A protein has these predicted regions:
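Cell-wall glycan-active module
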Residues: 1-75, 171
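Short, functionally critical alpha-helical segments immediately adjacent to catalytic or ligand/cofactor-binding
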Residues: 58-60, 64-84, 118-123, 138-145, ...
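Substrate-binding/active-site groove segments that recognize
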Residues: 86-109, 117-125, 140, 146-147, ...
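Mid-sequence acidic-hydrophobic segments that form the walls
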Residues: 79, 128, 171
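Hydrophobic recognition helices of helix-based DNA-binding modules
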Residues: 125-128, 132, 149
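LysM (lysin motif) carbohydrate-binding repeats in extracellular/periplasmic proteins that recognize
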Residues: 152-153
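Solvent-exposed, acidic/flexible segments
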Residues: 45-56, 65-66, 70, 89-93, ...
Length: 171
């Protein structure tokens, strides 16, 4: 076999091996870097609240840790508690992100600890986003509960929830 033929044979074999290796790599979840899911830029209006205290940075950090648009989470906390860590709703929701006691237990956070409450609120909102696929429906589920969003196949026809989604999401 001539050296020219060997070179062609080697090139052909190398091409086959490269193609196989690329195919195996593309099909291997283990070797691929983790997929980064960037939350959609859901045109959330800028946070325009006056609050600039210590909980603001905690809320921003919690939003970033969980991949939530910062302005969305800041507006949620503003709407939920007006940045009052001792806030308690008529339905029993507690703290900055207004977690229901049973939700806080499931998330294993102390709803009266501001840092844990914000962490729990961000985790819960992200969980709703993963379940429903849009921030609009995640907000509706955060407010009315995931069961209501499932039951109605979208934002429930409750005035409070519709207003909540509109105020936080901007439309």
């Amino acid at each position: 076999m001539s050296s020219k033929s060997r070179t062609k044979l080697f090139a052909a074999q190398k091409k086959i091996l490269d193609t196989r290796a690329a195919s195996q790599y593309n099909n291997s979840v283990r070797l691929q870097p983790p997929k980064v899911v960037t939350p959609s830029k859901w045109l959330t209006p800028e946070y325009d609240g006056r609050y600039r205290g210590r909980y603001l940075q905690m809320a921003k950090d919690a939003a970033r840790r969980h991949g939530i648009p910062e302005n969305l989470f800041l507006r949620l906390v503003q709407q939920e508690s007006n940045w009052n860590p001792q806030a308690k709703s008529h339905k029993g929701a507690l703290g900055l992100a207004q977690l229901m006691p049973q939700t806080a237990r499931l998330l294993r956070v102390d709803p009266l600890d501001p840092a844990e409450n914000l962490e729990g609120g961000a985790r819960y909102l992200k969980e709703q986003y993963r379940t429903f696929g849009t921030w609009r429906l995640a907000l509706a589920a955060y407010n009315a509960g995931p069961g209501a969003v499932k039951k109605y196949g979208g934002v429930p026809p409750f005035r409070e929830t519709q207003n909540y989604v509109k105020v936080i999401g901007g439309g």
